[in-house]
């Protein structure tokens, strides 16, 4: 790596440690020519993930959309912010562990519902009602019957 001070191409690593969020490695380097020290960061290159929406348009994956949907579904329910974050983490991990560069929004919705069902059934039904666009009370009842029968 080129020294930012003199441009020399060789250095030695003096110190190496993970950043606080564990998403990168911070390295202190020393130039072998001018002996000045500088910091570099090494991190995994993220390939942007595209979400294919119902209308077939594409947009970049946005974790905050998952969090916002979960927050609405869990409003006034005994679900902590930590649990909501864990669900978002779980969904994001499933997505990033796949080799896909595009994913359908419906697949993301199903992953969210699968995780939410384990945490709070009422929040699950709320999320499902918006996500699956329940049209009437019969659709609600059908979903609740499925939930009860799968216990």
Swiss-Prot record:
Q: Which residues form the ATP-cone domain?
A: 49-139
What GO molecular function annotations does the UniProt record carry, in alphabetical order? ATP binding; DNA binding; zinc ion binding
Database matches in InterPro entries: ATP-cone_dom, NrdR-like_N, RNR_NrdR-like
Query: Which branch of life, at top level?
Result: Bacteria
Zinc fingers, unnamed, are found at: 3-34
Among the record's GO biological process terms, what is one? negative regulation of DNA-templated transcription
Keywords in alphabetical order, please. Answer: ATP-binding, DNA-binding, Metal-binding, Nucleotide-binding, Repressor, Transcription, Transcription regulation, Zinc, Zinc-finger
Q: Which residues form a coiled coil?
A: none
CC cofactor: Zn(2+)
Note whether GTP-binding occurs among the keywords.
Answer: no
Cofactor remark from the record: Binds 1 zinc ion.
UniProt keyword DNA-binding, yes or no: yes
Pfam families in UniProt: ATP-cone, Zn_ribbon_NrdR
Report the sequence similarity comment from the record.
Answer: Belongs to the NrdR family.
The family database entries (HAMAP family) matched by this protein are listed as:
NrdR
Role: Negatively regulates transcription of bacterial ribonucleotide reductase nrd genes and operons by binding to NrdR-boxes.
**NCBIfam families (alphabetical):** transcriptional regulator NrdR
Q: What protein name is recorded for this chain?
A: Transcriptional repressor NrdR
What organism does this protein naturally occur in? Answer: Clostridium kluyveri (strain ATCC 8527 / DSM 555 / NBRC 12016 / NCIMB 10680 / K1)
